[in-house]
Amino acid sequence: MPEEKNTFYITTPIYYPSGKAHIGHAYTTVAGDAMARYKRLKGYDVFYLTGTDEHGQKIQAKAKERGISEQEYVDEIAEGFQELWKKLEISNTDFIRTTQDRHKTSVEKIFEQLLEQGDIYLGEYEGWYSVSDEEYFTETQLEEVYKDENGKVIGGKAPSGNEVELVKEESYFFRMSKYADRLVEYYNSHPEFILPESRKNEMINNFIKPGLEDLAVSRTTFDWGIKVPGNPKHVVYVWIDALSNYITALGYNTDNDTKFQKYWPADVQIVGKEIVRFHTIYWPIMLMALDLPLPKMVFGHGWILMKDGKMSKSKGNVVDPYMLIDRYGLDALRYYLLREVPFGSDGLFTPEDFVDRVNYDLANDLGNLLNRTVAMINKYFDGEIPAYQGNVTEFDQTLVDFKNNVVKEYEGSMDHMQFSVALNQLWSLISRTNKYIDETAPWALAKEEDKRTELASVMTHLAENLRIIAVLLQPFLTRTPGEIFLQLGLQEENLKKWDSIYGYGEIPEGTTVVKKGTPIFPRLDAEVEVTYIQDEMKGSAPAPAEETAEVEALETPQIGIEDFDKIDLRVAEVKQVDKVKKADKLLCFQLDLGEGKLRQVLSGIAEFYQPEELIGKKVIVVSNLKPVKLRGLMSEGMILSGEKDGKLSVIEANSALPNGAKVK
């Protein structure tokens, strides 16, 4: 049932404007937008924040290269981000820029407070600094070191692969170690603070247990930043400057802090996995020092990768979101981003997968359902939707029950930010509705005059399911739901609201559909469009490169018998199973391993099981296999099966074992 109205504050990271906004930025921001739209539909007062982090040495260097001022440079790049958000129809409430006076003033007050209460002190720092990462590293943290003939370290590379230089300077430090125990206690008492669960374990084992060192929070080697109050040769470093945006945008530390009082703490902060550490260690410790409540959740999502690894102009694999929107439409890109990759995991972008999603999911499954429904209502009832009657055909109640179950599952998935799972559940309703047409055979009913009541019932159930599907699509797609409402002739706003999905038979008798609906997603010529996208991606390279064999970036490791003890076997509960298109032997599983998110695993058992047979079973999974791509889908593990006479049977675990239990 609909929830009581409340506030909901969601943020993306503020993006560093050192280059053009790309599909990775779009992915994060579209995900946040889907959540913001979902909560608004459910009646929440939503504040959705995004923005740009505009200070630092890299910005200063980029502006110098261009021969323009730092402010001119960031103005230009920030405008590009806002243009992309407009093109993606992002419904953000605010766009914070760290060069804005509202941010600067609040940051100065935050720094002064931390200094006065002794959480910040003045000292001297020497370490290996990466300009690109804007981070210091100890010698032991370097991925690679360069030594002179005497063995002295003279340089190296950060874990990111970026070059480092030795920097020694006076710096203000934040007493991180003072809050380490308190932070771990908070993790333990708030299990959903860091999601997925694996990110929390990484923070504790890799950063907190080895011991938190005090953090340098000012710089003197560049001056493009907020000056430290009372000591202007220092600029406030990124940790306090950038991370504070989530509260400065709400008016924290100002005379008008109404928004801060209303919306803080944030309900969810979405970040890429590479900056989880900053948002789950530095940021909460800073808030503890300020005596402010911590965000309720920090969700670290994975990366969108290419077959040859990360996007790079030199590799010719950069995906331009503007190109995809202009050629295929906004909703095609928004759908692909959140359907293709389980949120929280890494995933691959391929032109083939993108075109397949448009053709199979959007054009065939959804588009054809709408086209057939509108055409039949015009043909059999002169374009008017008949009055609703329940349980007329033997298939009606089954369809309604299926809808009710999907709505429940969909809301559960959305509340846990499992966007791909929610869309998968929604598409199961689309598939079930298409199957309902085959079951009821309206073309046969139309031939018998005494079956007129049954035929009318089929039309109303199809129209009603499409209406509900359109409502459920609204968090993800910004234009398609309106087109579905338009073609069904639905003008009343109450038919488009979230509360309307809990009932059935809401469409008024006599509602007139359009005479001939335009296909909402025209089918693409797969060969032509795949080639087009590939050529556009290659066009991003500065010069032609030699042809190389196409290698998958993620390969399944070879494990010998002597390494068997390295295999991590876990109990997993099957939550969702789907057939894989164009692959007769594969099933796609969504598994709960107790990680705080579902894991996608593909298994070649489709000829031995129907998908619905497997839902709810406890299976055993090899959980530490490197992800591999099968038929365009990522598989993050392997389900164990036994074989007899050529038939595979899934090995089931005791149902009493908890999800994620280790098998020994």
Swiss-Prot record:
Major enzyme class: ligase
Example GO BP: methionyl-tRNA aminoacylation
Main subcellular location of this protein, as a coarse class: cytoplasm
Pfam families documented for this protein: Anticodon_3 (PF19303), tRNA-synt_1g (PF09334), tRNA_bind (PF01588)
UniProt-annotated binding residues for ATP: K313
Subcellular location: Cytoplasm
Enzyme Commission number, as recorded: 6.1.1.10
Swiss-Prot/TrEMBL catalytic activity: tRNA(Met) + L-methionine + ATP = L-methionyl-tRNA(Met) + AMP + diphosphate
One annotated Gene Ontology cellular component of this protein: cytoplasm
Domain tRNA-binding: 563-664
Keyword annotations of the record: Aminoacyl-tRNA synthetase, ATP-binding, Cytoplasm, Ligase, Nucleotide-binding, Protein biosynthesis, RNA-binding, tRNA-binding
Motif ('KMSKS' region): 310-314
A single GO molecular function term of this UniProt record: ATP binding
Keyword Zinc-finger applies: no
CDD domains: Anticodon_Ia_Met, MetRS_core, tRNA_bind_EcMetRS_like
Motif 'HIGH' region: chain residues: 15-25
Domain of life of the native organism: Bacteria
Function of the protein: Is required not only for elongation of protein synthesis but also for the initiation of all mRNA translation through initiator tRNA(fMet) aminoacylation.
Family from the record: Belongs to the class-I aminoacyl-tRNA synthetase family. MetG type 2B subfamily.
NCBIfam families (UniProt xref): metG, metG_C_term, PRK12267.1
Subunit composition and interactions: Homodimer.
Protein name: Methionine--tRNA ligase
Source taxonomy: Bacteria, Bacillati, Bacillota, Bacilli, Bacillales
